[in-house]
């Protein structure tokens, strides 16, 4: 009889030799004193390397700035959370009662962190070449679609250029809340933008990420509204 983890492994395209690693990768700090943050730290570095290496060889004539922007697009929390949802990762996460109640299994930051932790776990369970092949299989369609150029500018830059092009004042970002312990904080930022009726809210694990999230939402409202 197949276990839930067997089903997840099929979605990931990798079967763990050490089941303890995948279980640890799925354990949020709210659920246990042994949690996935160290694996997340490892996976973050591995992901950045694998994507940078692929972009370097895929785009031999593209400069460092464009490669950095493409990598940032591919490894940002929103993209990782999309991957997590493709794997139905929220169904497998181990969360504490508070996070369960607040819908943590749907939260971008928790899904993104778990994807990075799984990458770290696969590396420890195998080797760098295996984890490279797995990560590239997950990213295949995104790597095929990505192109250097303006679309890779971060949301804050794109919002600023959008407003400047229309002779509008620049956005104002204000941190309205910081919660959590120093190593596991969530920032809430309000972004006031000309042309948007009320401040746009963004959340993230750093001030910068929260500002980028707010800018992305503001751009969507300005261009779709």
UniProtKB/Swiss-Prot annotation:
Gene designation: rnc
GO CC term (a single one): cytoplasm
NCBIfam families assigned: RNaseIII (TIGR02191)
Main location: cytoplasm
Localization (cell): Cytoplasm
Taxonomic superkingdom: Bacteria
Bias-annotated ranges (Low complexity): 212-225
Binding residue positions for Mg(2+): 40, 113, 116
Name listed for the protein in its UniProt record: Ribonuclease 3
Subunit structure: Homodimer.
Gene3D superfamilies to which the protein is assigned, alphabetical: 3.30.160.20, Ribonuclease III domain
Function noted in UniProt: Digests double-stranded RNA. Involved in the processing of primary rRNA transcript to yield the immediate precursors to the large and small rRNAs (23S and 16S). Processes some mRNAs, and tRNAs when they are encoded in the rRNA operon. Processes pre-crRNA and tracrRNA of type II CRISPR loci if present in the organism.
Chain ranges of the DRBM domain: 154-224
Entry-linked SMART domains: DSRM (SM00358), RIBOc (SM00535)
Listed cofactors: Mg(2+)
PANTHER family: RIBONUCLEASE 3, RIBONUCLEASE III
GO molecular function: double-stranded RNA binding; metal ion binding; ribonuclease III activity; rRNA binding
Domain RNase III positions: 5-127
The UniProt record lists the keyword Phosphoprotein: no
Pfam families: dsrm, Ribonucleas_3_3
EC number(s) recorded for this UniProt protein: 3.1.26.3
InterPro entries xrefs: dsRBD_dom, RNase_III, RNase_III_dom, RNase_III_sf
Catalytic function, reaction form: Endonucleolytic cleavage to 5'-phosphomonoester
């Amino acid at each position: 009889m197949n276990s839930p983890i067997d089903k997840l492994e099929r979605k990931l395209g990798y079967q763990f030799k050490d089941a303890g690693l995948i279980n640890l990768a799925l354990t949020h700090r709210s659920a246990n004193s042994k949690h996935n943050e160290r694996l997340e730290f490892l996976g973050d570095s591995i992901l950045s390397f694998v994507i940078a290496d692929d972009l370097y060889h895929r785009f031999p004539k593209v400069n460092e700035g464009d490669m950095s922007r493409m990598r940032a697009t591919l490894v940002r929390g929103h993209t990782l959370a999309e991957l997590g949802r493709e794997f139905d990762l929220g169904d497998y996460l181990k969360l504490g009662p508070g996070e369960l109640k607040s819908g943590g299994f749907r939260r971008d930051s928790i899904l993104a962190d778990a994807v990075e932790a799984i990458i770290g776990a696969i590396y420890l369970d195998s080797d760098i070449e295996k984890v490279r092949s797995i990560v590239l299989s997950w990213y295949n369609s995104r790597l095929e679609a990505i192109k250097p150029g303006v679309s890779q500018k971060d949301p804050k830059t794109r919002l600023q250029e959008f407003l400047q092009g229309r002779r509008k004042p620049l956005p104002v970002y204000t941190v309205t809340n910081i919660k959590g312990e120093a190593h596991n904080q969530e920032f809430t930022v309000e972004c006031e933008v000309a042309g948007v009726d009320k401040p746009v809210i963004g959340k993230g694990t750093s001030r910068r990420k929260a500002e980028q999230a707010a800018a992305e939402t503001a751009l969507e409202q300005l261009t779709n509204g």
